[in-house]
Amino acid sequence: MDNLSDTLKKLKITAVDRTDDSLEGCLDCLLQALTQNNMETSEKIQGSGILQVFASLLIPQSSCTAKVANVIAEIAKNEFMRIPCVDAGLISPLVQLLNSKDQEVLLQTGRALGNICYDSHEGRSAVDQAGGAQIVVDHLRSLCSKTDPASEKLLTVFCGMLMNYSNEKNDSLQAQLINMGVIPTLVKLLGIHCQKAALTEMCLVAFGNLAELESSKEQFASTNIAEELVKLFKKQIEHDKREMVFEVLAPLAENDAIKLQLVESGLVECLLEIVQQKVDSDKEEDIAELKTASDLMVLLLLGDESMQKLFEGGKGNVFQRVLSWIPSNNHQLQLAGALAIANFARNDGNCIHMVDNGIVEKLMDLLDRHVEDGNVTVQHAALSCLRNLAIPVVNKAKMLSAGVTEAVLKFLKSEMPPVQFKLLGTLRMLIDAQAEAAEQLGKNVKLVERLVEWCEAKDHAGVMGESNRLLSALIRHSKSKDVIKTIVQSGGIKHLVTMATSEHVIMQNEALVALALIAALELGTAEKDLESAQLVQILHRLLADERSAPEIKYNSMVLICALMGSESLHKEVQDLAFLDVVSKLRSHENKSVAQQASLTEQRLAVES
């Protein structure tokens, strides 16, 4: 290392004299020392103050320029040397050298800039300010189609530099590269050089960095990236290499156009093959790959076009294979199968076909296996399927007679909000316009008590909202006195009154219709609860508020008329001077509201 100190002193003097021969000797010594012990040599270089000297040596006409760039590339392998390289003013002269015609200068300069950018925000910012990215993108464009070894070497270095440059938490550098049109160039490069492992890997990492950005998706969609990635994926045997392709596929597959391209390029068949190969393995990496493949499969089904293409009228091979995952003993496959079915069940035609072909029984069997200490994600996914399947009118009766309500009610004791939410949604869909089922459920005291409890789940707005909506639905669809009595006895009335003040018009309306039925069918039973929940005051507010939707005003007036049958509520109506508010509504632009206002006004006048 004494030798190194001499070299550094000599280099300082030589740098001033610019005698290329002795300069070259000094640089060779440095490179040798860096090969033997990079870290220690780099520390010495930093301590010697020679970095500033390097800036003056990075000149296009010198025969030593490539070696200087090589020394910088080597020292920048150390994290602690990157900011000193920036501070020494090396970036600007290095970026200037990117315009050189000398292959070796370009190669070493690309390495130096790439290493300085690695994991260094300061390095990337300096390259950005010096305009380095655009020059590198232009080089990639012109070299892209060349397959000679020297060009491929350069391509690998420049690709590596862009990979490090784009690996920034701040999106602005990635957005800048996208605007420079780097994506089509990299996709073309991947297609031409797919046999070259190092180049391919760098392309993939750069894609991964760019694919997270929404603005990149359109550019990717206009290339043949799907075809190239699937081609590459099929070739990979090693787990790590496949993982790299997966990391690009997942963010890209969030875009519907790319989903369809991936499906058309045969990705689904590859994924199904992986599932088949890995399903019985207990190796950690195989389990991880099975999860990635099945998750990606579900993601592809989130696009309407890609989903329909794979459904093929329920006859498709993919649909059949996914169906076979549900009875599997592998939790990950059960989950992916249920999520996939939930995605297929996004249109009525598919839902009707699946119910007619026995999907409900398969899902109920799956749920049955997860009742006691079951897998929450599987429960949630299976309930999501049943909820979607229950949307078409023709499916409701079939699902009810298949025993879906009984299967779903087994999860009433669940303490997991996602499961509670889907359970409520499924029941609400099932009883829509099904009077008998609504009555049966509405008289189920355990269910109604649980609903009332969940109506107070303030930490889980979704569960709270769905509980309220199901309470209202039980009344609206059953129109049953017994159901109303059960809800009154369980303390549900106050929640329906609160629901009438919801910020969602649909929920307000459902509450008002249910309350009108209560007032028409069981006013005596509910009277005290309606009073203590301050229903009359709330109705006055809804009618007086100009922001209330027409249907809210209409149903509020219908409800006021229905409440007149109760002495105490009637008195509250009189005390609040409803006539003033209602008479103003006679000139409302909505005809139904205006008409109902006239009727309500007459009723109020007669009863006063």
Curated annotation (Swiss-Prot):
ARM repeats lie at residues 89-131, 171-212, 348-391, 392-432, 480-520. GO terms for molecular function: guanyl-nucleotide exchange factor activity. InterPro entries: ARM-like, ARM-type_fold, Armadillo, RAP1GDS1. The N-terminus is blocked. Forms covalent cross-links mediated by transglutaminase TGM2, between a glutamine and the epsilon-amino group of a lysine residue, forming homopolymers and heteropolymers. Residues 122-171 are annotated as: Prevents binding to prenylated RHOA. The modification N6-acetyllysine is found at residue 231. Keywords: Acetylation, Cytoplasm, Endoplasmic reticulum, Guanine-nucleotide releasing factor, Mitochondrion, Nucleus, Repeat. GO terms for biological process: CAAX-box protein maturation; protein localization to nucleus. GO terms for cellular component: cytosol; endoplasmic reticulum; mitochondrion; nucleus. It is found in: Cytoplasm, Cytosol; Endoplasmic reticulum; Mitochondrion; Nucleus. Brain. Interacts with RABL3. Interacts with RHOT1. This is Rap1 GTPase-GDP dissociation stimulator 1. The lineage of its organism: Eukaryota, Metazoa, Chordata, Craniata, Vertebrata. The gene is RAP1GDS1.
